[in-house]
A protein has these predicted regions:
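Regulatory and interdomain segments flanking nucleotide-handling catalytic cores
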Residues: 1-216
Length: 216
């Protein structure tokens, strides 16, 4: 048994409404493509995001910034007909075995991630734009990171397909001219999209360590 006593951030994801997809095989391929994009962008992952069983995916990060960045990038990288829900759990973890799906892990980080994704699903019944929740300890005290996630998810949930693609492109370092060529629109139109929410999202990503705080 290999116990990791360092503080980690475990991420569990689940495709939203996957049974409504015309082709589950195509949906799974779109998910894998999105995860490849995210893993290239957030290359510091201790365990890159990867599909596990059914419609779930998992990953492990050393700090909260990268964990939360990865979750929003998955949403931006998926086709506009797909979305993903996430639970982020903080704590230690341990390797308890291995299977054809990879290492079998357990521990507080994973328990918290499971609680977090269940909470996100429950809260989305009255907060339909919510897609991400974090659990960092066993107390019931409110976590400022969840206040941030509520607003971030609501913003991204209101994006159309083009806004998601442009936002992803900005994170990847593309210029507005490049994005205009990609989308077949003017640079001015890209700038308008940027002012209509994308800029706020990018700024919030840059300030994640300050906004989210907590142990790293």
């Amino acid at each position: 048994m290999n116990r990791d006593t360092s503080f980690r951030y475990a991420v569990i994801g689940d495709l939203v409404g996957s049974r409504d997809q015309p082709s589950r095989a195509e949906a799974q391929q779109s998910l894998r493509d999105a995860l490849d994009t995210v893993n290239q962008q957030v290359a510091s992952a201790l365990q890159p995001l990867e599909p596990t069983i059914g419609d779930e995916l998992q990953g492990v990060y050393e700090d909260l910034h990268d964990a939360l960045l990865a979750t929003v990038l998955v949403r931006l990288a998926l086709p506009d007909t797909m979305d993903c829900r996430f639970g982020v759990g903080a704590g230690t973890l341990e390797i308890v075995g291995a299977s054809k799906y990879g290492l079998t892990q357990d521990g507080p980080a994973w328990w918290s991630a499971r609680t977090a994704i269940d909470t996100a699903k429950d809260k989305s019944r009255h907060l339909p734009g919510l897609r991400t929740w974090i659990v960092r300890d066993e107390t019931k005290e409110p976590d400022m990171a969840n206040a941030y996630l509520l607003m971030r998810d609501e913003l991204v949930s209101g994006f159309d397909a083009r806004q998601r693609r442009i936002a992803l492109g900005v994170v990847q370092g593309r210029t507005r001219t490049q994005l205009a060529e990609q989308e077949g629109i003017s640079v001015s139109a890209v700038s308008q999209r940027h002012r209509a929410g994308i800029g706020a999202l990018i700024e919030s990503i840059d300030h994640l360590p300050t906004i989210a705080g907590g142990a790293a």
